[in-house]
């Protein structure tokens, strides 16, 4: 099926109104895109934070009268009469196949591979985690996830308990279990993440060793030999007292989701309780690790 799209620029305040209107007049999907390469950090849970200068892209069936769409936008008064816009025909492709072709097995450290379920594992004797891209964050493609996976691969997890704080897809907890951990515990504020982690654990045959909790239901006396938290700098600092108590004495801590420019302030929150290692950087992101005193 062929498609046509309209792209127009908007402020963050109007973008959602324009999106709603485009859907009302027949758009099959609407996408927000950054028009000025502006980073967005640390939205609140449930918040959709947009760029100050946002491109709104509405996708329509190719038979749609786009002149009528433009006229409807003007009549809605959500845009000026002479608003700048671009209309493009979209090539008809097997989008699912193209999407699948973009994901390949990835190696982290010496032993660990993350593989999409539709790909053949490169090394059957390696530690293979089968994980498909989904709604919850974490497939190994982001530098922060890669940093955490490499760190877990470097540890001897045999017989240990691991907490994945902010578990998302469950990728870190599942990797830890496959790397030898006796038990893993995933904690997240998002029910979608709990569901995704459970499904991914089932697919990897480790569901019987993974416990999952919404953050509000986290047991009070919970502790582990290893705690990994791949969230963001703000929550890592705000939740430091909680995260610190999760780590057993002499236990290992790994933190990421941190921009390199934020490393110093995050280290300050944990340094009193941990002997911290040198910060490891990947692209603009970094990882902080240490052993509890």
UniProtKB/Swiss-Prot annotation:
Q: What is its EC number?
A: 2.1.1.-
| Coiled-coil ranges from the UniProt annotation | none
The molecular function terms in GO held by this entry are:
protein-lysine N-methyltransferase activity
Q: Name one GO biological process term.
A: methylation
Q: Which reaction does it catalyse?
A: L-lysyl-[protein] + 3 S-adenosyl-L-methionine = N(6),N(6),N(6)-trimethyl-L-lysyl-[protein] + 3 S-adenosyl-L-homocysteine + 3 H(+)
The broad enzyme category this protein falls into is transferase
Localization terms from the record: Cytoplasm
Question: What GO cellular-component annotations does this UniProt entry give?
Answer: cytosol
InterPro entries xrefs:
Ribosomal_L11_MeTrfase_PrmA, Ribosomal_PrmA_MeTrfase, SAM-dependent_MTases_sf
Q: Which residues bind S-adenosyl-L-methionine?
A: 145, 166, 188, 230
Q: Which UniProt keywords apply?
A: Cytoplasm, Methyltransferase, S-adenosyl-L-methionine, Transferase
Show the SUPFAM superfamilies listed in the entry.
S-adenosyl-L-methionine-dependent methyltransferases (SSF53335)
Question: What does the sequence similarity comment in the record state about its family?
Answer: Belongs to the methyltransferase superfamily. PrmA family.
Q: What does this protein do?
A: Methylates ribosomal protein L11.
- PANTHER family, from UniProt? ELECTRON TRANSFER FLAVOPROTEIN BETA SUBUNIT LYSINE METHYLTRANSFERASE (PTHR43648:SF1)
Q: Which HAMAP family match?
A: Methyltr_PrmA (MF_00735)
Q: What protein am I looking at?
A: Ribosomal protein L11 methyltransferase
Organism, scientific name? Actinobacillus pleuropneumoniae serotype 5b (strain L20)
| Gene symbol of the encoding locus | prmA
